[in-house]
């Protein structure tokens, strides 16, 4: 239903737009798909978002810039509409508390997960993309404890990522009625699974899935 691309070269691509192949690749991808394309990595200012939208992105993902300056969430949403702004949150459990990390999960912040979600929502984000650092790539299931932890504070569309290894992991995730979507990568890279077969499985479980 949606493709998310996160560029780990970050702000480097914005230094010389003409020489960086990322934008040409992005434009080519956008011309050959019929689903929304969400792109992130290194966004710091309004012009960065404009560049991505002009090269085929439908929505953008921000992370570190929001943690550095939460007011930028509001600034970006005011300019391009909140439906365009997805805030990704990288989380790790430390001393029995879910803590937010930055710089692709390498640096600990002072934010607890629920506190940060409240700020993100108050600043006008349109969507949250939630990732578990420990569960990423595990194929052992989503971090259901983390998802349950935010059940009383989340009021935005929520995409949950990290850990899916089989279809039952998706079924269990969607038992949380506030989860809007499930994101995954490794299950398609390292198994014989396909998106179509996943959707067919979820349909048999009476879940509302677009096939």
Task: Give the positions of each predicted feature.
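Conserved, mostly hydrophobic/aromatic
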Residues: 3, 39, 52, 87, ...
């Amino acid at each position: 239903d949606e493709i998310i691309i996160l560029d780990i070269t970050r702000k480097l691509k914005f230094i010389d737009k003409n020489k960086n192949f990322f934008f040409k690749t992005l434009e080519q991808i956008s011309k050959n798909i019929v689903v929304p394309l969400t792109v992130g990595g290194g966004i710091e200012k309004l012009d960065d978002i404009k560049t991505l939208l002009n090269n085929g992105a439908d929505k953008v993902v921000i992370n570190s810039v929001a943690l550095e300056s939460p007011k930028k969430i509001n600034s970006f949403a005011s300019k391009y509409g909140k439906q365009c702004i997805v805030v990704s949150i990288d989380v790790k459990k430390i001393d029995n508390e879910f803590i937010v990390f930055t710089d692709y999960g390498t640096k600990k912040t002072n934010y607890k997960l629920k506190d940060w979600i409240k700020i993100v929502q108050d600043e006008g984000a349109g969507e949250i993309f939630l990732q578990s650092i420990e569960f990423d790539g595990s194929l052992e299931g989503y971090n259901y404890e983390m998802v349950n932890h935010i059940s009383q504070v989340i009021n935005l569309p929520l995409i949950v990522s990290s850990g899916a290894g089989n279809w039952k992991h998706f079924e269990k995730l969607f038992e949380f009625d506030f989860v809007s979507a499930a994101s995954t990568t490794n299950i398609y890279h390292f198994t014989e699974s396909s998106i179509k077969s996943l959707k067919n499985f979820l349909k048999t479980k009476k879940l509302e899935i677009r096939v």
